[in-house]
């Protein structure tokens, strides 16, 4: 019986391992009990918070800076929000494993440069350039994953070094000379369908794939369980290092897609195109409610947070402030997001009494 098997396991493993195994059995029993009650739709705290914040922001924009919510500015905001959403989803996969990826700027720039430099405006060569950009992204992800997942280097140091390496490669590849996008890429990514930017549809498809992969596949559920408790996952026999490393691979693929998209919106690519996405890619993950300590990712909330942060930037821009203030606003949004989800506000209220 299951009870007898449970006793045998407890008698043959060490005390810490037995504790982890016992916790795993209890979690499985609770999950089975929940499933037996039938499906339930649940909205996470992160998604609800960022949804309400986004609605409030749009209301404020319509009252204080109406031009920021007119068709023109919104049409300009949506493509870049879509790019940020995809980059944020990549960062989310890494943060789920209690890591962080600082190679975002050069990873995005490299993909943009590849899909503009290789075709040289030739539409027939675009597909090969896109496949090359994705293949390079996989290689960069394997490098980051090996350094962090297997060699146990600090994620900040490892990815910062990778970012510098990629920047040097971009400068070698381009010689500091910008390259132009092909008409086909501009038409696919920069065009519209039924009045909606194509980039929004691409971001929605990517979001759907990420949600299905994390929620509906065995590999995705294992990925999330490892992020929640690496020690318990290791005792359960899951390959923690491989999953940690693969998070960086999938993240790089998403960064590459973001880079390809930005090349399809901005006609000229250079080595600095991705610089604006380092802080925001982390901010949207935090604002969406994913813990910096790892655990369950919230992809839908991350995408909504990308819309929130992009519109916030548009709002500040409509007020006529300079770039430095816009950066401070992004940093403040990140700090507020961390405070909302990590501070024990019950203790704060008790301390203030």
Predicted feature residues:
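Cytosolic-side transmembrane-helix boundaries in multi-pass membrane proteins
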Residues: 5-59, 208, 234-242, 316-353
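Helix-loop-helix "hairpin" substructures at the membrane interface of multi-pass membrane proteins
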Residues: 125-133, 139-144, 195-269
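Transmembrane alpha-helical segments in multi-pass inner-membrane proteins
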Residues: 255, 265-331
């Amino acid at each position: 019986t299951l009870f007898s098997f449970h006793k045998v396991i407890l008698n043959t493993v060490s005390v810490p391992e037995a504790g982890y195994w016992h916790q795993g059995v209890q979690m499985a029993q609770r999950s089975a009990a929940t499933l037996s009650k039938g499906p339930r739709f649940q909205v996470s705290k992160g998604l609800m918070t960022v949804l309400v914040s986004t609605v409030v922001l749009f209301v404020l924009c319509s009252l204080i800076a109406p031009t920021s919510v007119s068709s023109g500015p919104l049409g300009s905001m949506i493509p870049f929000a879509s790019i940020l959403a995809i980059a944020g989803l990549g960062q989310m996969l890494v943060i789920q494993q209690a890591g962080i990826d600082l190679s975002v700027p050069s990873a995005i720039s490299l993909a943009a440069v590849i899909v503009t430099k290789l075709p040289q405006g030739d539409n027939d060569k675009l597909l090969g350039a896109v496949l090359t950009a994705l293949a390079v992204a996989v290689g960069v992800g394997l490098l980051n994953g090996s350094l962090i997942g297997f060699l146990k280097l600090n994620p900040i140091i490892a990815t910062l070094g990778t970012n510098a390496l990629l920047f040097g490669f971009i400068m070698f590849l381009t010689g500091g000379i910008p390259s132009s996008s092909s008409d086909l890429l501009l038409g696919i990514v920069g065009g519209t369908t039924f009045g909606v930017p194509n980039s929004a549809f691409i971001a929605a498809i990517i979001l759907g794939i990420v949600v299905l992969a994390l929620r509906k596949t065995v590999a995705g559920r294992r990925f999330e369980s490892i992020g929640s408790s690496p020690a318990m996952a290791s005792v359960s026999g899951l390959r923690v290092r491989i999953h940690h490393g693969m998070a960086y691979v999938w993240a790089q693929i998403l960064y590459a897609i973001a880079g390809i998209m930005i090349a399809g919106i901005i006609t000229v690519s250079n080595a600095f195109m991705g610089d604006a996405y380092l802080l925001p890619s982390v901010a949207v993950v935090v604002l969406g409610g994913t813990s910096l300590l790892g655990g369950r990712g919230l992809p839908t909330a991350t995408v909504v947070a990308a819309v929130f942060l992009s519109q916030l930037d548009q709002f500040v821009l409509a007020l006529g402030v300079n770039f430095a203030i816009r950066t401070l606003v992004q940093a403040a949004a990140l700090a507020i997001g961390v405070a909302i989800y990590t501070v024990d506000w019950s203790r704060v209220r008790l301390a203030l009494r």
